[in-house]
Swiss-Prot record:
Catalytic residues (positions): 110 (schiff-base intermediate with dxp)
Keyword Cytoplasm on entry: yes
Similarity section: Belongs to the ThiG family.
Matching SUPFAM superfamilies: ThiG-like
Record's keyword annotation contains Transcription regulation: no
Source organism of this protein record: Thermobifida fusca (strain YX)
Location in the cell: Cytoplasm
Reaction equation(s) it catalyzes: [ThiS sulfur-carrier protein]-C-terminal-Gly-aminoethanethioate + 2-iminoacetate + 1-deoxy-D-xylulose 5-phosphate = [ThiS sulfur-carrier protein]-C-terminal Gly-Gly + 2-[(2R,5Z)-2-carboxy-4-methylthiazol-5(2H)-ylidene]ethyl phosphate + 2 H2O + H(+)
Record's keyword terms, sorted: Cytoplasm, Schiff base, Thiamine biosynthesis, Transferase
Pathway annotation from the record: Cofactor biosynthesis; thiamine diphosphate biosynthesis
Function: Catalyzes the rearrangement of 1-deoxy-D-xylulose 5-phosphate (DXP) to produce the thiazole phosphate moiety of thiamine. Sulfur is provided by the thiocarboxylate moiety of the carrier protein ThiS. In vitro, sulfur can be provided by H(2)S.
Name under which the protein is recorded: Thiazole synthase
Length: 266
């Protein structure tokens, strides 16, 4: 609808913040920092994406280093989200999360505990164990997990602030391999669902939002694109378009044609 007095439409004034643990974010795109060809390109890509938060692997980046990703985040004003990437046990994840809390003075953490280096698939047993213990220590946990509705429900039950099912293995670019399970997770959970891993291009990000995800987290799809800055902008628009399409409501799928205009009578 258009406001006759101002000429603006609902789309022009659309406000739909992402809320995690009571904090609001205007962008529903969360970025990662790994794989960028240079810090300059990373900074430009973060700006183009419109993101307000980006993950940083605490085991791989020195918080005190100069000329690093930390300088980029300070320059762009993007909030860092400590990540336990590279952890294979709950014990390692707890140690890394505590390091992030001390170094960055935040109790937010993206929990990532993988089973092996070949697949980088989440270890469900270690992930659930780590999540429960981190929540008990007062962390705001955003948990990376498989596209398993039962495990997603358990993670929410132990107190995770957001659950982050994968679309496909990390860095694979295969898109969303099991959209049905993602829909089941969205239907089941009362906490935000963030599609994490496997995104290859903008249409994958749009699909995640159309399936009902609250946000998308991606890194490789942007940082290793031929033009990372242009791809970051594409992802920004895709996430926005997918979210609006979800809220607008798609038409039902029909087996046969259905005329858009009724036949004239008489």
């Amino acid at each position: 609808m258009t406001d006759a007095a101002t000429g603006t439409t609902r789309a022009d004034t659309f406000e739909d913040p992402l809320v995690i643990a009571g904090e609001k974010f205007h962008s529903r795109l969360i970025m990662g920092t790994g794989g960028a060809p240079s810090l300059h390109v990373l900074a430009d890509a973060l700006r183009a994406s419109g993101t307000e938060m980006t993950t940083v692997a605490m085991r791989r980046v020195d918080p005190n280093a100069q000329g690093s990703v930390w300088d980029v985040l300070r320059e762009t004003g993007v909030r860092p989200l400590p990540n336990t990437a590279g952890c294979f046990t709950a014990v390692d994840a707890l140690r890394t999360a505590r390091l992030g809390r001390e170094a960055l003075e935040t109790n937010w953490v993206k929990l990532e505990v993988v089973a092996d280096e070949r697949t980088l698939l989440p270890d469900p047993v270690e992930t659930l164990d780590a999540a429960e213990r981190l929540v008990d220590e007062g962390f705001v946990v955003l948990a990376y997990t498989n596209d398993d509705p039962v495990l997603a429900r358990r993670l929410a039950q132990v107190g995770c602030a957001a659950v982050m099912p994968l679309g496909a293995p990390i860095g694979s670019g295969m898109g969303i391999r099991n959209p049905h399970n993602i829909e089941l997770i969205v239907e089941e959970l009362d906490v935000p669902v963030i599609l994490d891993a496997g995104i290859g291009t903008a249409s994958d990000a749009a699909l995640a939002m159309e399936l009902g995800c609250d946000a998308v987290l991606l890194a490789t799809a942007v940082t290793r694109a031929q033009d990372p800055v242009l791809m970051a902008h594409a992802m920004r628009e895709a996430v926005s378009a997918g979210r609006r399409a979800r809220l607008a409501g798609r038409i039902p799928i029909r087996r046969y044609a259905h005329a858009s205009s009724p036949p004239r009578e008489g």
